[in-house]
Amino acid sequence: MALVPYTETAEMGLQRFHKPLATFSFANHTIQIRQDWKQLGVAAVVWDAAVVLATYLEMGTVELRGCSAVELGAGTGLVGIVAALLGAHVTITDRKVALEFLKSNVQANLPPHIQPKAVVKELTWGQNLGRFSPGEFDLILGADIIYLEETFTDLLQTLEHLCSNHSVVLLACRIRYERDYNFLAMLERQFTVSKVHYDSEKDVHIYKAQRRCLREDL
């Protein structure tokens, strides 16, 4: 699914996932994200990495107005919703099983005049990538999508397909396991990777990646 399963040791930490709504303020809008831990599990709750990435977008470090963006493994859709509110044209993606829930959050939180800027589409990493034009997006977003090692090759293939030489990838994650570093090492073979933000309170890192370009004069 979309977001990473991990063990919250504090009982209070788990309680927030069982609330039917998670409320946030971004881009001068109140956003109410519907959650459904009981029925849909980890893909249907808002994890810290999504909040940190949405906050980073709101900082204005990345120019969103008019840009073409895609969110991978969107889950509840928070990051894509915020990107649309900040002016991006966003394709918000997840696996087919998650789409109905994802659409409900997107439709509930975008004003009518902004809704045309946000499209929800099915995307399973590594499959049917021909539905998307190569290098179609300026910005690729992912929050807590690095978690299952068996998906790393498909995720990397998907990033390579969606990126042009000028695209920017922003991945927000909490480093929990050695395999998380393994993915970053895989990513660095095809992309230049740098850490651009760290939220110490939530222990979430944001990594920026851009496709490595071969020098034409070599």
Curated annotation (Swiss-Prot):
Any Pfam family the entry gives: Methyltransf_16
Entry binding sites for S-adenosyl-L-methionine: W47, G73, A74, G75, D94, W125, A143
Highest taxon listed in the record's lineage: Eukaryota
GO cellular component entries: cytosol; protein-containing complex
Enzyme type, top EC level: transferase
SUPFAM superfamilies linked to this entry: S-adenosyl-L-methionine-dependent methyltransferases
Keywords linked to the UniProt accession: Cytoplasm, Methyltransferase, S-adenosyl-L-methionine, Transferase
An annotated Gene Ontology molecular function: protein-lysine N-methyltransferase activity
Xref: PANTHER family: HEPATOCELLULAR CARCINOMA-ASSOCIATED ANTIGEN, PROTEIN N-LYSINE METHYLTRANSFERASE METTL21A
UniProt name for this protein: Protein N-lysine methyltransferase METTL21A
Gene that encodes it: METTL21A
